[in-house]
Amino acid sequence: MPHYPVLKLSQRQIEYVNKFNNNPKIKFEKISCLNCSSANQKILFTNDRYGFNQKTVLCKKCGLIFLNPRMTQNSTEFFYKSDLYRNVYQAGNKSYKTEMIKYISSAYEEFEKNPKKPFFDIINSLNLKYQNVCEIGAAGGMNLKLFQLAGKDVLGYEPSEFLSNFAKTKGINVINGFIDDVKGEYDLVILIQVFEHLLNPIDVLKKLRKHIKKYLFIEVPGCITKFSSIQNAHNFYFSLNTLSHIVTKCGFKIIYIDYKRGHVNDMVYALFEKTDKIETYQYNYAYEVKKYTRIYYKYCIKIFIKRVLRKILRKINPNFEKKIVNIIDLRGS
């Protein structure tokens, strides 16, 4: 199994990665596959893109890719609430709050110039009838702003107090809270790059179902044609098949599901409708496993080639090495 390529980190990031890897408060637990309950798994990587000691595995029965062992509930909460998470996931040497204020302000300025996002275009193209929208993990409220501009009633829940307060300054009602704090019913509930962070998405879907009148929209970085950016904050890496299987067995039917290729991640977009008739989506497990095993070995070959090239080019000319090696996209298919 290859060592997943680690990004070039700032000194602050390196410091906090080491704090995580050597922190006795961080506990891990082994789990069975969320999708099929199998314990038969192949280890793909032993670390993530930041250097966290975190294994990523492929279920040999159904093809779901996930972290295992993964952080326990208490350790996950500690990770997100402490300074470990944000001080690694932002690249500068300044504090998280300083970097986040700069980032979110800049992002909003760009957004206001061109208020557009792929998931919103997809929802509009489906001609749905809905009025009120709830977003779980609403961050600074940009996603909800799109719906507000379209005349919809919006409400969000965001675990970060800083981000929920920022959203309010932009006229978006975002409550500082998460899944267990949701109240009321909504025509449309959206989870934009949140589902992959959950420890148990099935439990969350069962809780959310009672708050959904009609539709559920999910956007996740997926594994379709290549491996996504492997990181310890993403507990699962879904394909069209595995996402469909998990969501439909929780009382939803598929209205739309597709993906778009990106430089780093394949993005999966899916709309589901609440239904009382549960018909779990079925797919060919063996083919799924074969597909991702093939993608994995192709990826390993790319890693090997890049490392060999680096060694050779480093001896010739260090600057020439950087230019040539960057041509190879390690995360490509």
Each language-model region and where it sits:
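Conserved N-terminal segment of class I S-adenosyl-L-methionine
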Residues: M1-L188, I192, I202-L205, D266-V268, ...
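Short, glycine-/aromatic-enriched active-site segment of Class I SAM-dependent methyltransferases
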Residues: Q11-I14, L216-V247
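Conserved S-adenosyl-L-methionine
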Residues: Q41-D48, F252-G262
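A short His-aromatic
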Residues: Q193-H197
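A short glycine-rich, Lys/Arg-flanked "PGG" loop and its adjoining helix->strand segment in the class I
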Residues: I202-F217
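Flexible glycine/acidic-rich beta-alpha junction loops that bind and position SAM and/or redox cofactors
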Residues: I224-S229, H263-Y269
